């Protein structure tokens, strides 16, 4: 059966050809290898029609132009040569579009990313809409790749080399007005006249290339280029710690094109693309992409979710304010905050104001839109306005009696269908629901701080939570822009449970004479965004250590923190960044770079001896405990799958994405090797390193958690 065409050609009466992009049965337009023949057939027709004056590419999708290339194409490649051939095919197709003798214009609405932007760059001009959905970027680096269809060569010639490097090395996405300012697009217009403006542009001569700013012209020359690439290379190495080979290859390929010409540049681009596609880093990053896409499609349960029309929040603190913001401004739902103190409500409202006003200042949002979103948030010191709320999120202090009281008050003041979702990080949901009259409507909804930035939420049903309550809570989390994983109601849930032994071990090494900065640097070198000691300071030492006794009571000695260390720190009024002193001392509020290790921390915790561990030895001790605990969580069905375990660790605590998550990392090392490392560490440092039974069994049988493909579980 012949595949329906994703590209269709219609010639208007004014002899402008309209090529409509609409991938059949897909929400998003993505480029697939099999479309090449369709596009070539259209190009042949365009060349044969001598009456044509111009061409416009436009999408039929309501919210995307082309969201990128289909990543499965890369997964289907088994060798460097196959992946390189894929890139060369893309390059050739873009070259054929660019070589058309009449003006070719891309009319862009919605996401124009990756291969989509490379197609737009191959056109002679670009017009995009002023809609917030319209973004342009080359995010391939986030998959451990580089743009493989000419993007590394066309973009620097259009907008300059320094701006290009910033875009490609970070995967940064530009809004319409930013793209216009940089010269990436020729015009920004309302969606209603996009086609009309693109057609008018196609009737003119090819748009002449805009002269680059003086700074970009200097940086493109030999001296400026040498300085720029040295500086950017150094900065990139510091940021990636050498863990992401794609960044090094991007610099190499862009520089080759500028120094040796586009022919050499395209050749280098295709070769680098092929080699990067086969790296373990790219395979791991693509697995995270597939897993997160899969999680976002997971409804959480088989039951249909209940309608969600409005939400209530109990507690106007930092978490309550953040939850109100994502509920109103991301989910678009009316939200009412209850706090016993009017000041708490004011703080929560100010939180959303600050977030939105920042967007207005950066010109990412209109003032009218800010006001419209703020109008969705209201506050009260009692339960007025709560009767009809579909779901209440509780974000009060971590106190069981208080949370049980909140359940009783919600059941008394809200509708019979109202769901009660607790943002607890440590208390069992079953205990919170113990005295509820409708326990089936009580669930855990654990956000991470800062709420607006952290992508993960844990959804925690207790034994009596209904399937519909789970589905409805998952639905809300997705509307809030979060990636939800459903976890079992056991102490620490998943993320905090695997994080605690990792941080405990860092503190234990500190007491044996290792330096704060050495421990943190070792884990940053391993691939974490910050080290464990700094993480504790950022979260708040009082908040971050609260769960340790809960975990120790539930699981025993392996969760015990070094004796009296935590109490010594807290008794010295050290809470971390929030009060200016923890393991580090902090400068004025807002000056993030001004932090230094406080030498007084060592005598305070009774540190003894001189640190003798290398960076790999430090990271090995912390990470192995995390891996072991993650495997226990699978074994005890705390997480439903290793997919959820990998996503939870990467999105919840910043486990190095290029390793693919704890379970991908175990597979890459081999379960047997992990067992051998842990047995060695157990001999050296004690029984907390004893590998769990599941890991030992898998090592003996040579089993892995994932199949060889990026998307399937063993």
From Swiss-Prot:
One cellular component term from this protein's GO annotations in UniProt: cytoplasm
Record-level Gene Ontology MF annotations: 3-hydroxybutyryl-CoA epimerase activity; enoyl-CoA hydratase activity; long-chain-3-hydroxyacyl-CoA dehydrogenase activity; NAD+ binding
Major localization listed first in the record, in broad terms: cytoplasm
Site (Important for catalytic activity): residue numbering on this chain: 118, 140
BP terms from Gene Ontology: fatty acid beta-oxidation
UniProt region (3-hydroxyacyl-CoA dehydrogenase), positions on chain: 306-714
Alphabetically ordered keywords of this record: Cytoplasm, Fatty acid metabolism, Isomerase, Lipid degradation, Lipid metabolism, Lyase, Multifunctional enzyme, NAD, Oxidoreductase
Record's subcellular location: Cytoplasm
Keyword RNA-binding: no
EC id: 4.2.1.17, 5.1.2.3, 1.1.1.35
Pfam family, one: ECH_1
InterPro entries in the cross-refs: 3-OHacyl-CoA_DH_CS (IPR006180), 3-OHacyl-CoA_DH_NAD-bd (IPR006176), 3HC_DH_C (IPR006108), 6-PGluconate_DH-like_C_sf (IPR008927), ClpP/crotonase-like_dom_sf (IPR029045), Enoyl-CoA_hydra/iso (IPR001753), FA_oxidation_alpha_subunit (IPR050136), FadJ (IPR012802)
Catalytic function, reaction form: a (3S)-3-hydroxyacyl-CoA = a (2E)-enoyl-CoA + H2O; a 4-saturated-(3S)-3-hydroxyacyl-CoA = a (3E)-enoyl-CoA + H2O; a (3S)-3-hydroxyacyl-CoA + NAD(+) = a 3-oxoacyl-CoA + NADH + H(+); (3S)-3-hydroxybutanoyl-CoA = (3R)-3-hydroxybutanoyl-CoA
Stretches for region Enoyl-CoA hydratase: 1-190
Pathway linked to the protein: Lipid metabolism; fatty acid beta-oxidation
Family the UniProt entry places it in: In the N-terminal section; belongs to the enoyl-CoA hydratase/isomerase family. In the central section; belongs to the 3-hydroxyacyl-CoA dehydrogenase family.
The protein's assembly and partners: Heterotetramer of two alpha chains (FadJ) and two beta chains (FadI).
Protein task: Catalyzes the formation of a hydroxyacyl-CoA by addition of water on enoyl-CoA. Also exhibits 3-hydroxyacyl-CoA epimerase and 3-hydroxyacyl-CoA dehydrogenase activities.
HAMAP family, per the entry: FadJ
Name of this chain's protein: Fatty acid oxidation complex subunit alpha
Gene (UniProt): fadJ
